[in-house]
A protein has these predicted regions:
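Short, surface-exposed polybasic-aromatic patches that bind anionic ligands, especially phosphate groups
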Residues: 42-347
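Ser/Thr-rich, Pro/Gly/Ala-heavy low-complexity intrinsically disordered linkers and tails
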Residues: 1-49
Length: 347
């Protein structure tokens, strides 16, 4: 959830909250030849391999999402900002089973035909990809999953749609993300907006533009994904939400929040779990997530509940009540256990 501040722009990318049409049925991954991987393979582990999902490298290794921040200095306003972001609130794992409607699902595949896009709220901040005389055509199959689970309806929550086009794998895949997705009818997807991320590039969105996330960031690179946790290593920063956002931002974010109150957190602000945080008594899967927070940190990406960590939508999170175990451990991790990092000047 987020409060959107729409800034005027002359270009075209995409934006924010969530609305529309029921996703595929709950019987499992949609049966579509164009959707070939709802669950990624175990990530590569070789040196310099970067993050690999469904055969695609998720952004270059030197991208901010993949940056080791364990040695970065603290933000000069660390104490003042921390006082405004509920430092006594514990973390919450905001993900879980697809059939229960938890987490943000993603789909992947190649060869899907172009579908027309009807961006009803923010077409001026949505990425153009013209075909058939219309400005927006994305190769997203009709069976791509929508956030909220198989029983969700338009207007229920944020209804993000994330589609990884594996054409060009491993180094030149394309990520399509939409917010407030109403559904697919007669060859057309309807959503509030759409963003395209070329995963072989470190290019940022147009300055002042939002995306499917309020900050103008991609969502998929920051998800806690089931397969990574089970493999015992997450090699990227993690997405999370806070209640308030300042009306400036810091790269790689490109969009401002609505608050003019001094020392509120900015979109794109980077956080890091303290190196001396004691996690030895926690479940090994929880430790995998927390170690990533120490090495790669977290990005503040959207307004929502304080200290909600975002993960993927996968029924396997319910195996042995894994998500319950992680959330039990997260009750012993609070906002005050994190450090705010100095990654550049606000814009």
């Amino acid at each position: 959830m987020r409060a959107h501040v729409l800034l005027a722009s002359t270009l075209t990318l995409a934006a924010c909250n969530g609305s529309t049409s029921p996703g595929p049925d709950a019987s499992g991954p949609p049966h579509d030849a164009n959707v070939d991987a709802y669950r990624p393979p175990l990530p590569d582990s070789g040196p310099g391999s970067g993050v690999v999902v469904a055969g695609c490298r998720i952004l270059p290794q030197d991208n901010p999402w993949n940056q080791d921040v364990s040695a970065l200095p603290l933000h000069p306003r660390h104490a003042q900002i921390m006082a405004n972001i509920s430092p006594t609130t514990h973390l919450h794992a905001d993900w879980g089973a697809w059939t229960d409607g938890y987490g943000i699902p993603w789909s992947s595949g190649s060869g899907a035909p172009n579908a027309h896009m009807d961006f009803v709220d923010y077409p001026d901040e949505s990425d153009m990809r013209p075909c058939d005389g219309v400005p927006f055509c994305y190769p997203i199959p009709s069976t791509a999953r929508i956030e909220g689970g198989p029983a969700s309806n338009p207007g229920d929550g944020d209804r993000h749609l994330l589609y990884l086009d594996t054409t060009g794998a491993p180094n030149d895949c394309t990520l399509y993300e939409m917010w407030n997705t109403n559904g697919f009818t007669a060859g057309t997807w309807s959503a509030s907006n759409g963003a395209i991320f070329h995963l072989g590039s470190n290019a940022l969105r147009t300055e002042s533009w939002t995306s499917a996330d309020a900050a103008g960031l991609p969502i998929m690179p920051g998800l806690v994904r089931y397969d990574e946790v089970m493999a015992g290593e997450i090699r990227h920063a993690v997405r999370f939400t806070l209640q308030h956002a300042f009306n400036h931002h810091i790269h790689p974010a490109t969009h401002d929040g609505p608050s003019s109150t001094a020392d509120m957190p900015l979109y794109g602000l980077r956080f890091r779990l303290r190196a001396d945080f004691d996690m030895h008594a926690m479940d090994p899967h929880t430790q995998t997530i927390l170690r990533a927070m120490q090495r790669y940190g977290l990005f503040f990406a959207d307004q929502g509940s304080n200290w909600y960590i975002t993960g993927d939508s996968d029924d396997r999170w319910n195996d042995g009540d894994l998500i319950g175990t992680i959330n039990g451990d997260f009750r012993n991790v609070t906002g005050g256990d994190f450090e705010i990092l100095d990654t550049g000047s606000q814009i």
